[in-house]
């Protein structure tokens, strides 16, 4: 009989969102008349920007002609998209990132997991707690952790608690680590990092020859012009950081799939024999071997994000969701609930009322208000007693959800 990857058996009972789905399905089966409002998983609800739709329609028409047909494209992404990304997302903010250092993909979740393919198994890993579950689970699947304890934490990982007590700012580890996962604006807490805070991480990484994996999937939601959008706005970050970004939330590409990873040339790791190896070459080889690239049609849609019309439409989308977040913050605060986040990110992180644990509050909202959110404990032990609500929904649904919660 074929053997399975035993590391998968170390995973906790269920990935957070499938467990939410299981409970919601059971509730809906028992209460088919219930009108659920989903403010849980961070999936967008508004239509794709017109500029992106027009570009994809045009690309489809091209594909219908012999002259305009495109088969396999470059695994790294088409040059015209990579150049637009480099110019508008990085160089415009003073980051020395070239088009060649950008790899277009079908999702930052995939990339933040797949990056482990080019990193050794003996690295000491640090994650915040609470944390986006994919960072932890992908390391478990790859055999980079020990077993999980009663508190849900895995052996072999360094956990960096973030809470209201420390302003949701992870403290620099007291011991050396090799791999650091940072996400700003943060999922799930909605917290942001200043340049000074990121500078401390870059200084630590350079001093300890560590690698920062920086998830900037929500950078478009930052409202304060003084806050950094990229780790590469920090001097020295090219020497110690890989950055992940996505078109999913700012441009509504959750269903069309397009993202990017930045691997600076000159960024190095260490081989078993002690020699230094450039990570760009390893990632390029990995993508060329295991990935066929994002479709031509989708990349044309992503390129349109950088057109004048696309920029305005994306800005309007972001503003719409941030207005939703402001409504959620205002209404929860008026109801006497302690709230965090939601000012530079599309997530509101609330303290569960009356000392309820996270999953009890989930069930309470589901059963009494027919509102679906995300239990904070699903993001880690330090998330117990917190709860995440997403601003990704229609205005009418957000208003109705808040009315239901107020009436509890």
Swiss-Prot record:
Identify the keywords attached in UniProt to this record, alphabetized.
Aminotransferase, Pyridoxal phosphate, Transferase
Pathway(s) of this molecule: Amino-acid biosynthesis; L-lysine biosynthesis via DAP pathway; LL-2,6-diaminopimelate from (S)-tetrahydrodipicolinate (aminotransferase route): step 1/1
The residue ranges crossing the membrane are: none
Say yes or no: keyword Transferase present.
Answer: yes
Task: Write down the EC number.
Answer: 2.6.1.83
Q: Which Gene3D superfamilies match?
A: Aspartate Aminotransferase, domain 1, Type I PLP-dependent aspartate aminotransferase-like (Major domain)
Residues bound to pyridoxal 5'-phosphate are: 72, 108-109, 132, 187, 218, 246-248, 257, 292
User: Which reactions fall under this protein's catalytic activity?
Assistant: (2S,6S)-2,6-diaminopimelate + 2-oxoglutarate = (S)-2,3,4,5-tetrahydrodipicolinate + L-glutamate + H2O + H(+)
Cite the InterPro entries for this sequence: Aminotransferase_I/II_large, DapL/ALD1, PyrdxlP-dep_Trfase, PyrdxlP-dep_Trfase_major, PyrdxlP-dep_Trfase_small
Q: Where do the annotations place substrate binding?
A: 15, 42, 109, 132, 187, 292, 388
List residues modified as N6-(pyridoxal phosphate)lysine: 249
Q: Name one GO biological process term.
A: lysine biosynthetic process via diaminopimelate, diaminopimelate-aminotransferase pathway
Q: Which cofactor does it need?
A: pyridoxal 5'-phosphate
The Swiss-Prot or TrEMBL record annotates one GO molecular function as: pyridoxal phosphate binding
**Family that this chain belongs to:** Belongs to the class-I pyridoxal-phosphate-dependent aminotransferase family. LL-diaminopimelate aminotransferase subfamily.
Concerning NCBIfam families, the annotation shows:
DAPAT_plant (TIGR03542)
Per the entry, what this protein does is:
Involved in the synthesis of meso-diaminopimelate (m-DAP or DL-DAP), required for both lysine and peptidoglycan biosynthesis. Catalyzes the direct conversion of tetrahydrodipicolinate to LL-diaminopimelate.
Subunit annotation: Homodimer.
Please give the name of this protein. Answer: LL-diaminopimelate aminotransferase
What organism does this protein naturally occur in? Synechococcus sp. (strain CC9311)
